[in-house]
Each structure stands twice: as C-alpha cells, then as structure tokens.
Amino acid sequence: MSIVLFLIVFILLSLIVSRYLYSVALNVPSKIDVVFNPIEKLIYRLIGTNLEHMSGKTYIKHFLLFNGLMGGLSFVLLLIQQWLFLNPNHNLNQSVSLAFNTMASFLTNTNLQHYAGETGLSYLTQMCVITFLMFTSAASGYAVCIAMLRRLTGMTDVIGNFYQDITRFIVRVLIPFALIISLFLISQGTPQTLKGNLVIETLSGVKQTIAYGPMASLESIKHLGTNGGGFLGANSSTPFENPTYWSNYAEALSMMLIPGSLVFLFGRMLKTKQQIHPHAIMIFVAMFVMFIGFLVTCLYFEFAGNPELHHLGIAGGNMEGKETRFGIGLSALFTTITTAFTTGTVNNMHDSLTPLGGMVPMVLMMLNAVFGGEGVGLMNMLIYVMLTVFICSLMIGKTPSYLGMKIEGKEMKLIALSFLVHPLLILVFSALAFIVPGASDALTNPQFHGVSQVLYEFTSSSANNGSGFEGLGDNTVFWNISTGIVMLLARYIPIVLQILIVSSLVNKKTYQQHTQDVPINNLFFSSVLIIFIILLSGLTFLPDLMLGPIGEQLLLHV
C-alpha cells in the first residue's frame, strides 16, 4: 500500500511541477521574478551572453563548448586535488585514466564511480567538481530537451538561448528544490560538515575511521538531477547518505520528479499552461505501465529468493546485499526507480540481486526511455514515438506524419542512427571486454554472471545511469578508458542527432488538420508504443540476455 501511495504522490507532484516548469521554460512572467531576475542578470553579465535567440546549430555548438570547458577544468582539478585546500583527509590525486573516467562520468550525468568517495576525492573536488557537474549536467540535459520540445511545438528555427535555459533551470528549479531536500536530509541525520573524518574507539578498543563531510548538499542534487554518484562508496545504502525510511522515500521521489514533470510539460507546450495535450498523457501512460511491469517483476523475483537456498530448507526472499531497514520491497522499488529514471544511486547492491531481478534494471537501461534521465529520457522516448508512428503509418498505407510534420527519408535515417547508437556501444564494447588481453581479469564471477557484470557495466555507461554490478574490478586502464568513451559518445551523439531530427521536421510543420495521420491521443497508441519498444529492444539484446541473466536463472533450476 505504501508503494501505491508513493506512486500516486509522484503523479500528483509531476502535474504540479510541470506547471511551474512551463513558466520557467517559456519565460512566462511570474511573481517570483523579483527574487530570481537580479540573480540571473548577474550571471548573464558574468558569462557575457546577450540572450539572443539561437538557431539549432548555434544552440548545439554552445552546448558542446560549455560541456567541453567544464570537462577540461574538472579533469585538471582531479589530477591535482591533493595539493589543493579542503583536503583534511589527505586524499591523493586520481590517476590519469581514473580522472578521465570520473570527468566523463559526471559531465554526462552518468556518475559511474570507479573509486570510493571516502578515499578518492577531497572535499574540494566533491563540491567543485562532483556537485557542480551534478547541477550543470542535469541543466544541460534539460536545456536540450526544452530546445527539442520548442521545435516540435513551434514553427520557427529559433529555439531559445542555451545559457538562458540552463541558468533559469539552475536558479529557479535545481537550487531551490535541492536546498529544501538538503534541509530535510539534514533533519533526518545526513551530515553536512567540512571537518575531516572522525576517528573513534569502539567498545572492543579498536580505532575506527568514520567518513563524513558535505554530504547533504551532494545528496539532494544527486537525486533531483538524476545523477546518482555517492559521497561514500556504498552510496545510499549507508546510514549517512540515506538515514531513515523517510529519507529513502524523499530520495526516490526526488529522482522521479523532474523526468515525470517534463512529460506533462510537453503536453502543456502542445496546448496551454492549464491543459495537457492527450498525446503527452498517452506517452506518460506508456512509460508508467512499463515502469509498473518492471517493478512487479523485480518484486516477484526478489521475494521468490534463491532456489539453491530453498533446497537447503532456508525459506524467504533474497536479502543478500540489502539493508534490513529497507527490506526487499523498498530495495526493489529503489532499484527499479534508479534505473528507469537513469539515476544510478543504489540503496542495495545490484550485483546481489537474483538473476531475473537483476535483469530488470539492466533491461530498463537498455530501453533507456522509461522516463529516463533529466531531459534526455523524454528525448529518447520521442524517438521511439516517431519510429512507432512511422511504422504504423506504413502498415496501414498512410503518410508518416507526427504533430503535422511529415517524417521522410532524411528524418528516418537520423532516427535510425539515434536508435542504433545505444545498442552498438553496449554490444561492441562488451565484446571488446572479452577480446582485449587482461580486460576480463576484472571479472569476479565465472560463467553467466560474469557476462552479466560486463553487460551491465557498459549498459549503465551507455544509458548514462552509473549503477553497477560492483563485483567487477573496474578501476583499471581498460575499464576506465572504455567506459569513459562509451559515456561521452552515448551522451552527445544522440543529442546532436535528435536536435537535427526536429530541426528538419520543423520546416514541414503546419497547423492544418491531417485526417490521414495515425491517431496518437488514445490508449491504443500507448499499447502499440509499448509493444514496439519491447520488440525493438528485445530483438536487439535478447541473445546477450540469454548469455547473462536468463542463462544464470536457468542454471539455478538445473
């Protein structure tokens, strides 16, 4: 019942926040302008932007330049952190390969971690690299999504100003929301301090080091921005990052909030601030139905437990790798949310999930469109929508058209490329891990689970998720460089292609009613969309899943 109430709250909050995002995205005057306008104007003066509207190419150019500059500065700081201030625990510099991986990870909103935060970063880099990139990567994803939505709902090549979009989103959404969440987490027991690690003497007389630091400020944006990287190595399974039952719900809800709201925002942009277009509701229904299906699957297999233990007379579900304070139910819920919304934070160890329970987060990342991350999740879903409309139109002999825009050969080539980037990166680099000498030494499990570890690592990297089957010994040159390359390519190539797609479509947009268009405003469309998503991704990844989690599940029942 608590999960049902939680999901109802998610839907209601998404509806409410989407109204606020409408004002932020479309520069609608509001009463709070008196607070935020002076801050924004100061930022515009500092960065030297004149707020001129940009064309699609200019928007993407500044998006890439901005991200490149942030990545370069972050890379340098990670290489010299031990010589800088705010390093009370005297943590050392990161190696070149690890610094590259960390930079690529947080720059792309992935937050894959091949280090433990307790020993791998200073407080300065935790705040000025990690937390900073958590804000800017989330805002960058939001900005390009809004640019795409403006194209789909408008009739002009002008899509706004990149710097204005990210500034308004950070100042008006991320910082205020993150501040509220941080204060709540502090009230629940999450530390926020610049003091060094605490050394205590236990009852047995042994000295123990307790790592803490500026955690609450990182935790809030970690979830709100669908980032996922933890201050500590064990992430949100630790009692500092996730102290209570209520903090667990707050963290889960905060990572769902903005991706869910963006779907309704799309509907409002298609219609009005007060009304949501039925097409956006049908997209939300498709996403939500798939989410519920995967959640139920994960719950079922985790509560079913391990048959090998049942043969020994040990009843019960799979509690391995889980916090007793959360149990199986909340752990499965968190697992499904963190991979559906491509956050990557964990409150249990995914490597300890049952084979098919662990396949749920893997498949969600392979789909990469069941809500997805900040902005890019909706962009990926819209590619599936266009594919569905195109195929359905051809099947019934109608001209492929989406929102009054004809989908022709040029657009379909770009749509196909955008769709293929994700599976190609996963499959090619997973194969390389078994071919390159020494790469497979990182595997800690033989047979099927070893394949699952490799597949999960590259799927998480390509989906910009960041969670992992952490039995993999991944802090090596091969794994640092390969996953870093995957994260960068999987982030930027699809975004560029998707903006090119809508830039091409917008030139064909008309407000005339087209009776020959495929209906996209009913539950039948949602059903067909779900079927196409499952079929397209299933045909792509099923052979690899057979060699991984499905094979492992069959092995348990031999």
From Swiss-Prot:
Main location: membrane
Keyword check for Transmembrane helix: yes
GO molecular function terms noted in the UniProt entry: P-type potassium transmembrane transporter activity; potassium ion binding
Record's subcellular location: Cell membrane
Listed transmembrane segments: 1-21, 60-80, 129-149, 169-189, 246-266, 281-301, 326-346, 353-373, 376-396, 415-435, 485-505, 523-543
Topology with respect to the bilayer: Multi-pass membrane protein
Stored InterPro entries: KdpA
GO cellular component: plasma membrane
Alphabetically ordered keywords of this record: Cell membrane, Ion transport, Membrane, Potassium, Potassium transport, Transmembrane, Transmembrane helix, Transport
Oligomeric and partner information: The system is composed of three essential subunits: KdpA, KdpB and KdpC.
Function, as annotated: Part of the high-affinity ATP-driven potassium transport (or Kdp) system, which catalyzes the hydrolysis of ATP coupled with the electrogenic transport of potassium into the cytoplasm. This subunit binds the extracellular potassium ions and delivers the ions to the membrane domain of KdpB through an intramembrane tunnel.
Family: Belongs to the KdpA family.
Protein name (record): Potassium-transporting ATPase potassium-binding subunit
Organism: Staphylococcus haemolyticus (strain JCSC1435)
